[in-house]
């Protein structure tokens, strides 16, 4: 397809239509509770596991605005001067295909306790807590097939909540909803120069694959609970 010539400067004309842009993307989700949670150290993260092949783990944003209006000096309908943002919500739907015991504890909303005495010794028990959510730090890694760069979403605070169970390929899945929480903190020494790039909802990093572990080690020390 030949595009008409134009004086407009299209900066990505050589790459915008490449078939290599169709590369498939895989995701990894890490979560670190900010309150004591048995089995997960304060600076530790739980890997939520593998997801169904058709899972779309991407943020859904809901932004509510309220218009500020004024009388139209020429008559007719009022004119809109500005719009105030009244509320912001960012959520992820996360179906987990391979939940281990730690992930199932997160799905329960509380760590299980081991029964140490009596005929049930060695068993585990956890409370049923409908609607319970766990506050923590959330990292979502996005890797594209055949690409060196990895996109990493960093949310210093999020609520992780059970959203029941589902089904994929005749296998049960545990469903989570992660809701990002606004949270301000002072970045550590590695990121302090880039404080303006980290909003109360976090930041997105783009790093080479060989620097992913360095970034994760850096984020492990960020936004720790007081």
Regions found by a protein language model. Give the residues of each.
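Acidic Ser/Thr/Pro-rich low-complexity disordered segments
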Residues: 3, 35-45, 141-148, 190-209
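Beta-strand elements of well-folded, non-transmembrane domains
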Residues: 96-100, 142-146, 159-161, 182-186
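Extended Gly/Ser/Thr-rich low-complexity repeat segments
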Residues: 107-116, 195-203
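Short helix-loop boundary/capping segments
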Residues: 108-159
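Mixed-charge, glycine-accented linear interaction segment located at domain edges/termini
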Residues: 154-226
């Amino acid at each position: 397809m030949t595009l008409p010539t134009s004086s407009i400067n299209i900066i990505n004309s050589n790459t915008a239509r490449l078939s290599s842009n169709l590369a498939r993307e895989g995701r990894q989700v890490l979560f670190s509770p900010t309150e004591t949670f048995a089995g997960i150290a304060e600076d530790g993260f739980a890997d939520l596991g593998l997801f169904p092949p058709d899972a779309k783990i991407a943020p859904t944003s809901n932004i509510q605005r309220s218009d500020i209006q004024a009388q139209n000096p020429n008559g007719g309908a009022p004119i809109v001067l500005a719009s105030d943002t009244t509320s912001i919500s960012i959520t992820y739907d996360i179906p987990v295909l391979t939940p281990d015991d730690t992930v199932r504890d997160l799905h329960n909303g509380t760590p299980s306790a081991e029964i140490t005495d009596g005929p049930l010794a060695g068993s585990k028990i956890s409370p049923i807590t409908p609607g319970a959510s766990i506050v923590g730090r959330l990292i979502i890694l996005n890797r594209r097939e055949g690409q060196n760069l990895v996109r990493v979403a960093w949310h210093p605070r999020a609520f992780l909540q059970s959203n029941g169970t589902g089904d994929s390929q005749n296998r049960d899945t545990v469903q989570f909803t992660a809701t990002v929480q606004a949270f301000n903190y002072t970045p550590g020494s590695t990121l302090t120069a880039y404080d303006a790039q980290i909003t109360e909802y976090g930041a997105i990093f783009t790093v080479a694959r060989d620097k992913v572990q360095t970034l994760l080690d850096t984020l492990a020390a960020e936004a720790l609970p007081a």
